[in-house]
């Protein structure tokens, strides 16, 4: 958002939305149910990924969060042999003892299960960490470097540049 718009929004918030008519009840809008939304999203991700994970035996920790339904459909479709943990979200247990904030559980599962690697998402699936077959953490810097090098080799890294935030 432009700074001017953001500042205007802040003024409304600071003044408890004075001057804005808030809709309630039937005035708010309508709800439309789409049962195919998840599959549409998985299809979009699949078509966006230019890779084949055939032969990769991976353990994926979904943090009892947003990635639980998506990952279980996407990664096998990419050819990976997958075992999933943290796939029972109940609205209260997101990140509880699982996911990228508790990587030790994935590291242990990878070593004990003989997996090639592990991937752990955070609850809202906007970040992930990983580990190698020995359970050694692979942080975001390493993951980005590997992805950038692979994209560069394939001529898909615009300007040979990866742009990230300090939180990456």
Model regions and ranges:
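Gly/Ser/Thr-enriched, mixed-charge loops and adjacent short helices
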Residues: 1-113
């Amino acid at each position: 958002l432009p700074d001017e718009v953001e500042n205007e929004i802040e003024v409304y918030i600071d003044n408890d939305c004075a001057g804005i008519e808030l809709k309630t009840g039937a005035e708010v809008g309508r709800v439309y149910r789409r049962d195919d939304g998840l599959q549409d999203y998985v299809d979009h991700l699949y078509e966006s990924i230019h890779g084949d994970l055939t032969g990769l035996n991976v353990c994926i920790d979904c943090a009892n969060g947003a990635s639980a339904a998506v990952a279980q459909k996407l990664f096998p479709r990419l050819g990976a042999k997958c075992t999933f943990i943290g796939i029972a979200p109940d609205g209260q247990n997101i990140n509880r003892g699982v996911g990228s904030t508790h990587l030790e559980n994935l590291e242990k599962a990878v070593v004990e299960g003989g997996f090639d690697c592990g991937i752990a998402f955070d609850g809202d699936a906007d970040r992930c960490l990983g580990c190698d077959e020995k359970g050694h953490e692979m942080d975001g810097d390493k993951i980005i470097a590997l992805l950038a090098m692979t994209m560069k080799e394939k001529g898909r890294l615009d300007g040979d540049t990866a742009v990230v935030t300090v939180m990456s």
